[in-house]
A protein has these predicted regions:
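A glycine-rich, hydrophobic loop/mini-helix early in the fold
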Residues: 13-54
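Contiguous, small/hydrophobic- and glycine-enriched helical/loop subdomains that border
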Residues: 41-88
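Long, positively charged amphipathic alpha-helical accessory segments at protein N-termini or as interdomain linkers
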Residues: 60-62, 66-79, 101-178
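Beta-rich nucleic-acid/ligand-interaction surfaces
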Residues: 81-104
Length: 178
């Protein structure tokens, strides 16, 4: 999945991705490219009136939207933190990334904020490095030596099946909304 402004040919090895059976799609939010395999990722989206983030910086709105997730992941035993503007990471690497778009009010409507997150439940790191072009700058920002070590999937840390992780995250999200 490529962000709205990304150059697909710079961010992905398009021919390799197609040979591996991937379809490259573009989302309407910013951020980088995401490597998504069905069953190996967990995603969620929030859609709220723009007033939800009124008076907040972009960074504050990311933290508000993902606070419940960070707490839920900690309850699963993961040592997670916010990393930069849009990443959720452990001491070993990136666990997930968020992106956001704000829609201005139109036709008398309130405007909206779209926020979504992709989490690595499990990952084929070697395949990811073949499909994505991850820059040296990105690696140095993350203080890791290889793209394969850049991502830290939760399966190896929790020992839980994906369905159990999803169920616990849903329970945490429901508790926050009540």
């Amino acid at each position: 999945v490529s962000s709205t402004a990304s150059d697909v040919y710079k961010r992905q090895n398009v021919h390799t991705a197609q040979d591996e059976g991937f379809h490259i799609v573009r989302r309407c939010t910013g951020g980088g490219a995401m490597f998504i395999e069905p069953g190996n990722t967990i995603t969620y989206s929030l859609y709220a009136p723009l007033d939800f983030a009124h008076g907040m910086s972009v960074e504050e709105s990311y933290e508000l939207c993902d606070y419940w997730l960070v707490e839920a992941l900690r309850a699963l035993g993961l040592n997670v933190r916010f990393a930069g503007l849009n990443d959720i990471a452990t001491q070993y690497g990136k666990l997930g990334g968020a992106a956001q778009r704000r829609f201005a009010p139109t036709h008398g409507g309130p405007g909206a904020i779209l926020h979504h997150v992709t989490l690595a439940y499990d990952i084929d790191a070697e395949k990811m490095t073949r499909v994505l072009n991850i820059s040296r700058e990105k690696m140095s920002d993350k203080a890791v030596k290889s793209a394969a070590k850049h991502v830290d999937p939760m399966r190896s840390q929790t020992g839980m099946g994906r369905d159990e992780v999803v169920a616990r995250l849903v329970d945490a999200a429901v508790r926050v909304t009540m």
